[in-house]
Amino acid sequence: FFAETFKTLFRNLSENSVMQKLLLYEMTTINSTTKRSAETRDVMNLNLITFYENLFAPAKINIKSIASILIGGIYYLILHKECAKICTIDYKTKEGENAFSEGIDFLTDIIFDRLEMYDRDKKAIRQMISDGISESKICKYMGINKNDLKTLLSE
């Protein structure tokens, strides 16, 4: 669902010239109307962002930052695609859209792999504790410090 959200934004914005013009207008004209329009768009996504923020917070993944970078990148790719290729990719074409989708899938895999790794490490640490392995050895084996260990054990 995470990756599909960004793919849908890319497709919908690609096909919506009115929204593209609105984004350009918001970037070039700062007034109460453009601010309200941009802020409303941000608020509309608040529930989704909060869901992901809660999901990724234990693994210390700043998903709001990642999402904002991806959204900003999508805006740029769409608004710039008529001007020139970006990194030799022509985002006006089906191949360009496929390249975008592959990139989003790759980044999503990395983000979710980190979350899974965090959960796996937490389980391994708890198992080591129950097996009687000392905290200092756990820190050594896991490559973490005592504060990180305490954080993992407190969650």
Name each model-derived stretch.
Residues 117-133:
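Short, amphipathic alpha-helical "recognition" segments used to contact nucleic acids or chromatin
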Residues 4, 11, 15, 22-24, ...:
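Amphipathic alpha-helical packing segments from all-alpha helical-bundle domains
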Residues 147:
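Key DNA-contact positions within bacterial/archaeal DNA-binding proteins
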